Amino acid sequence: RSPFAIAAQLIVLVRPMLPIMLAAIVMGVIGHFCATFITIFGGFALLTAAGLPSPLAGVGTAFACILVFALLRGVLRYAEQASNHYIAFKLLALIRDKVFGALRRLTPAKLEGRDRGDLISLITADIEQLEVFYAHTISPVCIAILCVTGMTCFTASYHILPALVLLAGYLLVGIALPVWSARRGDKAAREYRQALADTNSYLLESLRGLRDILQYQNTAARAEGITAHSETLGEKQKALKYREGLTVAITNTLILFTVIAVLGVSLQLYRNGQMGVEGVLI
């Protein structure tokens, strides 16, 4: 099945807790706007202090707004994360119940097979990864779409060109880079997953055959095998972490270049008389 089909099937499980998810999205959007407008109010304060046109009455008003928005940001962030993790852990409990129900029908015959390491990985690591999906993917994607739309429109209220540059940066960081990273890292992720399953299977075989290992004095060879599996798993994990680090570095670089590009376009528009100094500053 395609990743989109799997994601759609996982999203369906959220339906009973849809009100909580919607609340998390609303709080996330408001919270991100609060965080963004903290710096914008700082810009308004500078405009007011310099005697330039500003939507605020005075510098004191700007600082009061900054304080209120900072407090709101903290409260809303906490509430958003609490809602997302409540949904995630409730659904993880539901999924684990379904998995263990299926295992009860399969055991003990299924655990005698060579793929029992896959089952252990499924019960532990794989299900834990769903916490990232439910707590840090569904609502953040919705929040990102709404915030990108809002900030692009806000920037366009000063001039359309910096808004288009900003939108291009959003699309690069939010869509193009994740798709590229996922395609490049797919092989490494699958290799790590297989190495983890192989290690689990080897450890289970060692535990189940511990009496025979001791009887035939095969402990040294078995220990070397465990070490070899652990080293292989470590190498696969290292490759995966390298790709994660590379993605983070590229993300930060794109964000920096986007900021510089927006500033450069705004300065050029200011020189041409198409944008005021307040637009450049904000």
Task: Specify the residue positions occupied by each region the protein language model found.
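Transmembrane helix-loop-helix hairpins at lipid-water interfaces of multipass membrane proteins
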Residues: 21-76, 156-161, 272-278
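An intracellular "coupling" helix at the cytosolic face of ABC transporter transmembrane type-1 domains
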Residues: 12-19, 108-109, 125-134, 138, ...
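Transmembrane helices of ABC transporter permease
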Residues: 16, 20-31, 136-191, 261-277
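Transmembrane helix-loop junction
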Residues: 44, 48, 105, 156, ...
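Membrane-integrated ABC transporters
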Residues: 1-35, 55-62, 80-84, 88, ...
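Juxtamembrane helix-loop junctions of ABC transporter transmembrane domains
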Residues: 3, 35-43, 67-112, 116, ...
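Hydrophobic alpha-helical segments in the permease module
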Residues: 62-77, 170-172, 244-258, 277-282
